């Protein structure tokens, strides 16, 4: 993609951490419990439907007891997450902050959780076109099946320009950061021929509503 491309770039700051809702945690595949760990009051998670209220179990040498499975994030608490890179591998760390107390919840491979979320939400564009996941995530899509050269922006049809406006709005209003590189080769047999490379902050993709919006934009020219 060295020539004839259109670029939309917002060189903002990739967020170091982000707040999430219960609907996001559910989409990641987790239940949030209030109970005890080794007799001490704590919040912790288990896979959706795996544990029940009143259950006591052992995990990695510690005893857990579930008093209550939360339906919402407690009013005085915040669910936060961040991406860390260790030995060349990304991890999603998420925790609950309740006033001055921090309850670590899990540290998982973000690729596994994103796949779980995207499959649950049937976000096939994201599943098909993701290329790399780290602090940022790269998507690449190529639908070019003709021998041609990229067209200048002035020759883009209205539908293509509408997609570019959507991307600008996402970068400006939601992400604050993003890089979208686009080549358009024209339309043949009612099929748009184009290539795109889209880089976005990974944390935002764990938000159910944002993930749905990105998936929608990736499929607008299909």
From Swiss-Prot:
One Pfam family, short name: UPF0128
- Annotated coiled-coil positions are none
Q: Which domain of life is it from?
A: Archaea
Which InterPro entries does UniProt cross-reference here?
UPF0128
Q: Which family does it belong to?
A: Belongs to the UPF0128 family.
Name of the protein: UPF0128 protein PF1488
């Amino acid at each position: 993609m060295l020539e004839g491309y259109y670029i939309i770039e917002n060189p903002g700051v990739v967020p170091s951490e982000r707040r999430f809702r219960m609907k996001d945690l559910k989409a990641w595949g987790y239940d949030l419990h209030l109970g005890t760990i080794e007799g001490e009051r704590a919040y912790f998670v288990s896979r959706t439907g795996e544990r029940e209220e009143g259950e006591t179990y052992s995990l990695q040498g510690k005893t857990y007891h579930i008093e209550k499975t939360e339906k919402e994030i407690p009013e005085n608490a915040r669910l936060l997450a961040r991406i860390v890179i260790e030995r060349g591998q990304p991890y999603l760390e998420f925790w609950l902050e309740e006033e001055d107390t921090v309850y670590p919840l899990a540290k998982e491979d973000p690729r596994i959780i994103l796949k779980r979320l995207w499959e649950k939400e049937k976000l096939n564009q994201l599943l098909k076109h993701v290329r790399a996941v780290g602090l940022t995530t790269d998507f690449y899509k190529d639908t070019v099946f003709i021998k041609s050269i990229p067209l200048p922006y002035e020759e883009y049809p209205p539908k293509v320009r509408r997609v570019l406006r959507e991307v600008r709005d996402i970068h400006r209003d939601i992400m604050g950061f993003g890089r979208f590189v686009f080549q358009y080769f024209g339309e043949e047999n009612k099929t748009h021929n184009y290539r795109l490379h889209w880089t976005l902050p990974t944390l935002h993709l764990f938000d159910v509503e944002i993930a749905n919006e990105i998936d929608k934009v990736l499929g607008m020219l299909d």
